[in-house]
A protein has these predicted regions:
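A generic structural signal for beta-strand entry/edge sites
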Residues: 4, 52-56
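Active-site-flanking beta-strand signature of metal-NTP-handling nucleotidyl enzymes
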Residues: 4-10
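Short, charged/polar surface micro-motifs in flexible loops or helix N-caps
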Residues: 14-15, 54-55, 62-67
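Short amphipathic alpha-helical segments
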Residues: 17-42
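An amphipathic, aromatic/His-enriched active-site/gating alpha helix that lines ligand/cofactor pockets
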Residues: 41, 62-99
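Short beta-strand
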Residues: 46-51
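Short, low-order "capping/linker" segments at domain edges
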Residues: 94-114
């Protein structure tokens, strides 16, 4: 089984940095070991959407998400996160050390009458 999660994060509001961030996430640009690590953490699908300087991640995750990575996976994850840090700006509601903040679903068409 899997479930959908949505997370939010802001980017530094700088057009050049935003363009660089998008290039870093273009097909083939993300390090293969990062992609493997994402899957190893329990993500079965993931998309990142952007409007202005706001990012929204929509992901399907395994029921046991988030999974811990092995030492090698943690090292790669740490390097990737460090490479992305200068692009990203946590939301004001983020906790200490938190970047991607989970969002709460407030509406579902399938749950509506009619």
């Amino acid at each position: 089984m899997s479930r959908r999660v949505c997370l939010a994060l802001d980017l530094v509001d700088d057009a050049d940095l935003i363009a660089d961030y998008e290039r870093a996430h273009a097909p083939g640009a993300v390090w293969p070991e990062v992609t493997r690590g994402i899957r190893d953490k329990g993500f079965t699908d993931m998309e990142i959407w952007r409007v202005a300087d706001r990012l929204v991640m929509i992901a399907q995750v395994a029921d046991d998400w988030p999974r811990d990575l092995d030492a090698e996976g943690r090292a790669v994850d740490t390097r990737w996160e460090a490479a992305m840090d200068h692009f990203q700006r946590p939301l004001s509601c983020a906790g200490d050390g938190e970047k991607w903040v989970p969002m709460r679903r407030i509406y579902s068409l399938g749950e509506q009458a009619g």
